[in-house]
């Protein structure tokens, strides 16, 4: 063989070379896998971005303006939707912000509401990725709006600060929502027979002004009306009990109109009138009874007390009437004040009667003694006896009896015997014997008992019956 170096095969060298190739192949595989995953992620991200762009394309102001211009082109806001085809259905909803105050003098109440109306207008349908157009009040005058008015409103104010409190929304299917905030002074005719224990249902009525029911139909959007928290309402003398809504039809010369009504049930709080009227009246009546325990000879004290209580009741009755309208019927408070006045006046008259007859008693006793002295020597009469003319009838009287006549007059002598010297004699049997000196004792029992019975009947009758 020729000369040269011999090639020597080494197993260790072959193993190291194979190991290096495997390592390089593994690194290449990992690198390619990362590249593929990154590429897949980028593809998924691009696909997601493409989907988002397709479902929600960006809407520009020019697109909305173009939609509005196309809707208003050829639109006549003087004509209602579906005129000549079918009635326009108006769904109404009311949110009550507050009620009060209630004015019983003018018989009206104030209410703050958000009034919402919804209807369909096929002329306002549009095709767009936007489902609803949220517009301000400037658009209201350009489309047809229902001519709804509040029938029992005396004064209504729309809120304009800082901007007109009106909202208009148009959906792509032609549905229109129109809301506005109103403050209304509405009539509420109060029946004051049970005042101040009265309850009232104050209505709020609205309907179309010119469209009868064959043109416009009103419906409630919800079964009940929503209200804010009543504890912030300025009802003062009243408490909010609840509300209810109804639908009625009014028959008029111009047609049949649908009337929507909300009734606000109110109950009067008695705290103010209890403190201002009832308690002072009761205390004044009780004060008038003090005269029954004062000596009947204390004329200035009993007279001044009686006159003072009468004048106090007159003042209380005048003050109580100031919070009421000038109604022609008697209210529950009028009845109570009048009865209290009668009790006070009767207490004064009781002392007047007592003083009158006790004064006559003394004068007639003196005259009777003089007459007895003159007739003591007359024949036919035993000693110690005298004849006293009593309504054309002469009766013998003892020396210890009063020498004065009974009450003059047919009625009195027929039913009453008012003095001690009238108690004897068969012709006085069956009559009521009243001793003038004991009228105060009778009054101490009669007046409180009668007043307590009146209060029992009064409060049970007005509060529970």
UniProtKB/Swiss-Prot annotation:
Protein name (Swiss-Prot/TrEMBL): Gamma-aminobutyric acid receptor subunit gamma-1
Function: Gamma subunit of the heteropentameric ligand-gated chloride channel gated by gamma-aminobutyric acid (GABA), a major inhibitory neurotransmitter in the brain. GABA-gated chloride channels, also named GABA(A) receptors (GABAAR), consist of five subunits arranged around a central pore and contain GABA active binding site(s) located at the alpha and beta subunit interface(s). When activated by GABA, GABAARs selectively allow the flow of chloride anions across the cell membrane down their electrochemical gradient.
UniProt entry tagged with the keyword Hydrolase: no
Tissue: Expressed in brain.
Source organism (scientific name): Mus musculus
Signal peptide span: 1-20
Subunit relationships: Heteropentamer, formed by a combination of alpha (GABRA1-6), beta (GABRB1-3), gamma (GABRG1-3), delta (GABRD), epsilon (GABRE), rho (GABRR1-3), pi (GABRP) and theta (GABRQ) chains, each subunit exhibiting distinct physiological and pharmacological properties.
Lineage: Eukaryota, Metazoa, Chordata, Craniata, Vertebrata
Main location: membrane
Topological domain spans for side Extracellular: 21-273, 321-328
Membrane topology: Multi-pass membrane protein
Keywords tagged on the record: Cell membrane, Chloride, Chloride channel, Disulfide bond, Glycoprotein, Ion channel, Ion transport, Lipoprotein, Membrane, Palmitate, Postsynaptic cell membrane, Signal, Synapse, Transmembrane, Transmembrane helix, Transport
PANTHER family: NEUROTRANSMITTER GATED ION CHANNEL (PTHR18945)
Modification after translation (UniProt): May be palmitoylated.
Subcellular location: Postsynaptic cell membrane; Cell membrane
Gene Ontology biological-process entries: chemical synaptic transmission; gamma-aminobutyric acid signaling pathway
Gene3D superfamilies: Neurotransmitter-gated ion-channel ligand-binding domain, Neurotransmitter-gated ion-channel transmembrane domain
